[in-house]
Design a protein with these regions (language model features):
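Short coil turns that delineate tetratricopeptide repeat
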Residues: 169-172, 204-206, 235-239, 268, ...
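Single-residue signature of alpha-solenoid repeat helices
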Residues: 157, 194, 226, 256, ...
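Residue-level recognition of tetratricopeptide repeat
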Residues: 145, 183, 215, 249, ...
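TPR alpha-solenoid repeat register
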Residues: 177, 209-211, 243, 273, ...
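Canonical BTB/POZ domain core
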Residues: 1-75
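Hydrophobic/aromatic packing residues within the alpha-helices of TPR/SEL1-like helical repeat arrays
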Residues: 161, 198, 230, 260, ...
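Structural motif corresponding to the intra-repeat A-B loop/turn of tetratricopeptide repeats
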Residues: 150-151, 188, 220, 250, ...
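Alpha-helical protein-protein interaction/assembly modules
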Residues: 42-48, 61-160
Length: 676
């Protein structure tokens, strides 16, 4: 009737059956036309009828209301799948966005569902716009990354990256999309397609894709061509670490060593040079030197490949306790990890190694944890906690929480969040669960919500962790200096509650910091001294600060020296000690910091400032540029811009930090190559 000439309106009985709407649905539409509200009790099938009707006859208000009502009914993945298909067919962006939100919250698990993968992999341009509007490229970037993280050779990863190429509009987007799809094609041994994609990325201006072209050339038997490609890049652009690393794969002997050393000099964060040198030393029976070499990178970058290699070294030396430590650290970072190119499950290796290691009791484990925590041995602490979690009667909530603290300290945010979620899942009580939820909220930027969870936990039962969380969140959320008194009171309440000395030491240390901020130096010193009595080694740093503020620079220096001697990971201690000595000693300490942890930016800023003071502007800028090449830190970029402005050079400066690395292993086959 509605699409005709309305002749039916003269009839006593009007046939509505051809309009795809039931009488019940039509009555709901009639009610909406009078009230502007859809009935809350309408079933799903009627809402779908109404949506189709509204779309067919351009009833925009009705369609929007129906969209929102349907969006509120999504309660399962299957609901989201069914409604997404309807939303794409009926051009309903609100409903599509709600379904998409459900899928994104369900990542990465939802990508194991073929229906979900099919929706994203087969969506055409119109459907992608309905789902994500102008954010299509970002959406497929995320989906591609998740799929590649799970299995870079999978059909899902390839399909999502093909869509990413279709979504790419700007030159930068095309560079990234072509390069990543080229990497996946290469891993799938589709060499011609990979070469074509890397060529397209290079043509779009992505210099790094030359490395992909070199890999393809080598696999096709043209090793010399690969070497020449990288040599041309090195001669044409400002040299960067990855250029020398990639070229080292296509040469031998002294040239290989020179390229690897140059790669480490330009970018000390690259894993392969350390791994190659360590493997070479191990083959030469220099086990101690090999372990020292691999420890150089593990001192500031907790990489699974390097832990794997060190595990192999210790296994060859029959040091089973150290082997077990590294295995348990690997399993903490990646519970389903498989070693030796995926052939052996890490859990299986752990069972075999454990047979050669004396079993620790629960009391032994706690003693070992105290010892390693006090020695700032974070990898060792992770291993002990993993072993404690393996016990049938373990207090898993507390242990997973401790694990998350260590992982955050090691700059591993994703495993840390997983551990926090496990802590919440295994919480022994409602008040503990609220505390762990509070930390999850705090760590994801929802400070006020985290504070409320702490308060609710305290209302159930006063506990150390609840007071500690509240103090921590309050100190961070309130810029008002007057809140210091409240934070002090909360930390004192925490210290009155039962806890172990690891956490008490942390609370005392934090309390000392608040007292320092309030200029109550004697009280701060008392807190730090008490923390040291329970072996909270980092309290040396706070005590040094108190000495310094009391104009006792020598005592501050000596206090930091004690921390350096005790801590296994002591780059930050050297950095702090540099503040309490003269310029020459400062220079030495900061050089040590850069050797131990080249990712710490303060030494570069200090050296650049000293050079600038000496009117060595070019050298100062070069010092900052050296660090920016592998760590695009905001402070370094601002400082370099200020230096350029000072010398009258108004330039827009771009680094290559942050370029995606090739998804091609440079470990197994390359490590086993012989060196002349």
């Amino acid at each position: 009737m509605l699409t005709g000439c309305f002749t039916e309106s003269f009839q006593d009985v009007i046939d509505m059956s051809e309009n795809g709407i039931s009488p019940f649905g039509m009555r709901a539409i009639c009610d909406f036309s009078q009230s502007g509200i859809l009935n809350d009790l309408l079933p799903l099938d009627i809402l779908l009828e109404i949506l189709i009707f509204a779309n067919k006859f351009c009833c925009e208000r009705l369609k929007e209301a129906c969209d929102r009502k349907l969006a509120s009914l999504i309660s399962s993945r299957q609901d989201a799948v069914d409604l997404m298909e309807c939303a794409l067919e009926e051009n309903s962006p609100v409903l599509a966005a709600s379904c998409l939100q459900f899928f994104l919250r369900d990542l990465p698990d939802c990508l194991q569902d073929e229906q979900v993968v099919r929706i994203f992999a087969t969506a055409n341009k119109r459907q992608r716009v309905i789902m994500a509007g102008n954010g299509c490229f970002s959406l497929y970037c995320l989906l591609s990354e998740v799929a590649m993280d799970s299995n870079p050779r999978s059909e899902a990863a390839a399909s999502f990256l093909e869509k990413l190429v279709e979504c790419a509009v700007s030159n930068k987007q095309k560079q990234l999309a072509f390069h990543l799809l080229g990497c996946v094609r290469l891993l799938r041994k589709e060499y011609d397609d990979a070469e074509h994609l890397f060529d397209a990325a290079v043509a779009a201006g992505h210099v790094y894709s030359v490395a992909g072209l070199a890999r393809v050339s080598c696999l096709k038997g043209h090793k010399l061509s690969s070497y020449e490609k990288l040599s041309n890049v090195i001669s044409s652009y400002a040299p960067l670490g990855w250029m020398y690393l990639e070229r080292s794969l296509y040469c031998d002997g002294d040239r290989k060593w020179e390229d690897l050393d140059k790669a480490s000099e330009l970018d000390p964060t690259l894993l392969y040079p350390y791994m190659f040198r360590a493997s070479f030393l191990m083959r030469k029976q220099s086990a101690e030197a090999a372990i020292l070499e691999i420890n150089r990178i593990l001192g500031f970058k907790l990489a699974l490949e390097c832990l794997e290699l060190r595990f192999c070294f210790y296994l060859a030396l029959e040091d089973y306790r150290a082997s077990l430590r590294d295995l348990q650290a690997i399993l903490t970072l990646s519970p389903d990890h498989r070693m030796f190119d995926g052939r052996v499950a890490c859990t299986q290796l752990r069972r075999l190694v454990k047979e050669h290691v004396e079993t620790w009791t629960t009391a032994d484990c706690w003693l070992q944890l105290y010892e390693r925590w006090s020695a700032v041995d974070d990898i060792g602490s992770l291993s002990v906690i993993y072993q404690m979690l393996d016990e049938p009667d373990a207090a898993k909530g507390i242990l997973y929480f401790r694990q998350s603290l260590l992982l955050l300290r090691l700059n591993c945010p994703r495993p840390a969040m997983r551990s926090l979620q496990l802590a919440r899942q295994h919480a022994a009580s409602e008040q503990d669960r609220l505390v762990y939820e509070g930390w999850i909220l705090y760590d994801t930027g929802h400070c006020e919500e985290g504070l409320r969870q702490a308060e609710e936990s305290i209302s159930i039962q006063r506990s150390f962790e609840a007071f500690f969380l509240k103090a921590y969140a309050l100190a961070d959320s309130s810029p008002d200096p007057s809140c210091s008194a409240t934070v002090i009171s909360l930390l004192e309440d925490a210290l009155r509650c039962p806890s172990d000395r690891l956490r008490k030491g942390q609370a005392l240390n934090n309390l000392g910091s608040v007292y320092v901020d309030c200029e109550k130096l004697d009280l701060a010193a008392d807190c730090y001294t008490s923390a040291l009595k329970v072996q909270h080694t980092r309290a040396h740093q706070g005590l040094a600060r108190v000495h310094f503020l009391k104009n006792n620079r020598k005592s501050a220096y000596e206090e930091m020296t004690k921390l350096i001697e005790k801590a296994r990971n002591n780059a930050s201690a050297y950095e702090k000690r540099s503040e309490y000595c003269d310029r020459e000693l400062t220079k030495g300490d900061l050089e040590m910091v850069t050797r131990l942890d080249p990712l710490r930016v303060y030494p570069y800023r200090y050296r650049a400032a000293v050079l600038m003071d000496g009117h060595k502007e070019k050298e100062a800028i070069a010092e900052l540029t050296r660090a920016i090449a592998f760590k695009a830190d905001l402070h370094l970029l601002h400082l370099r811009a200020a230096f350029h402005e000072h010398i009258g050079m108004w330039l827009v400066l771009f680094g290559t930090a942050g370029l995606p690395s090739l998804l091609i292993p440079t470990t197994r086959r390359c490590l086993s190559s012989k060196t002349e």
